[in-house]
Regions:
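Class I SAM-dependent methyltransferase SAM/SAH-binding core
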Residues: 50-105
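Residues lining the SAM
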Residues: 118-120
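C-terminal lobe and adjacent flexible extensions of AdoMet/dcAdoMet transferase-like proteins
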Residues: 218-265
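A short glycine-rich, Lys/Arg-flanked "PGG" loop and its adjoining helix->strand segment in the class I
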Residues: 132-144
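Conserved class I S-adenosyl-L-methionine
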Residues: 1-46
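SAM-dependent methyltransferase
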Residues: 149-228
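A short acidic, Gly/Pro-enriched loop at the edge of an enzyme's catalytic core
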Residues: 107-114
Length: 265
């Protein structure tokens, strides 16, 4: 699995266009429609820097955030304390619990009413059987009829957006960091359906020089029928698959699938 240690500091800058409030609206709409009530406890699997976890916490949800990167969770914890200090998270709001665990073998203290997994995190499960194993664990920790909501990158995105394309992120200096520059190179193998990402990060130090760090990541492209099959084999009922946060129908050029599944017990 990727540890995200190098990219942790710029992860939120790279994903600055993500609308976490709209994503949370989607989850709350599903809770209302399919559960009829707010789940008492929600798992955010592969929570990263905790942006989604904290957005849900602001809305009064008791959250557990699980991620395999200690660096990402350190960012999440810092963000939590910043929200407490600023009053953005009210005194009566439950405080999220962050756990550093691999999503292929995580353990919880009990069950949850719903589980979410955002930003194609499940595509990082590249080994044979790993997706099904993760689904099985999620099912194990869900209450009867609990919801599992997640998204995955599509074959179209791997072929046409990633492919062998390179992307550059230029991040200006801020209050707590110098200027940063990230080069993201993709190499997608259509035969193995594995995409390798090579990230090079340049960070400005206090003396004006730039320090270089490198990180490699890898995602697997899953077909829609593979995801459906893995859900069915692990005891889930697939409720819906849509193309966007607004519930759009699937199309040939869909970049991201959004799934809602229910745990059958």
């Amino acid at each position: 699995m990727n540890d995200y240690n190098t990219i942790a500091g710029v992860y939120d800058s790279i994903n600055s266009g993500v609308d976490y409030r709209k994503w949370a609206d989607l989850f709350e709409g599903a809770f209302d429609k399919y559960l009829g009530e707010r789940p008492e406890l929600v798992l955010d699997l592969a929570c990263g820097t905790g942006r989604m976890t904290l957005e849900m916490a602001k809305r009064g949800y008791d959250m557990i955030g699980v991620d395999g990167s200690a660096e990402m969770l350190a960012r999440a914890t810092d963000a939590l304390y910043d929200m407490i200090d600023s009053g953005e998270l009210s005194e009566d709001s439950p405080r999220p619990l962050f756990l550093c665990q691999d999503m292929r073998e995580f353990e919880l203290y009990g069950t949850v009413g719903a589980a979410i997994c955002c930003l194609d995190s499940l595509n990082y499960l590249t080994g044979d059987g790993e997706l099904q194993k993760c689904f099985s664990l999620v099912h194990n920790y869900l209450d009867p009829d609990g919801l599992f909501m997640f998204d995955m990158n599509t074959p179209y995105k791997f072929t046409n957006i990633y492919g062998e394309n390179a992307y550059v992120y230029d991040m200006p200096a801020g209050e707590d960091a110098g200027a940063r520059f990230c080069v993201w190179q993709n190499f997608y193998d259509e035969e193995t359906r594995i995409c390798d990402f090579y990230l090079t990060l340049f960070e400005e130090s206090e003396d004006g020089k730039y320090e270089r760090s490198d990180e490699e990541q890898r995602e697997r492209c899953y077909r829609l029928d593979e995801v459906r099959d893995a859900l069915e084999k692990t005891g889930f009922e697939l409720i819906s698959v849509t193309a966007d946060l607004d519930g759009s129908e699937l199309a040939d050029d869909t970049h991201r699938w959004h799934f809602i599944a229910r745990a059958k017990k």
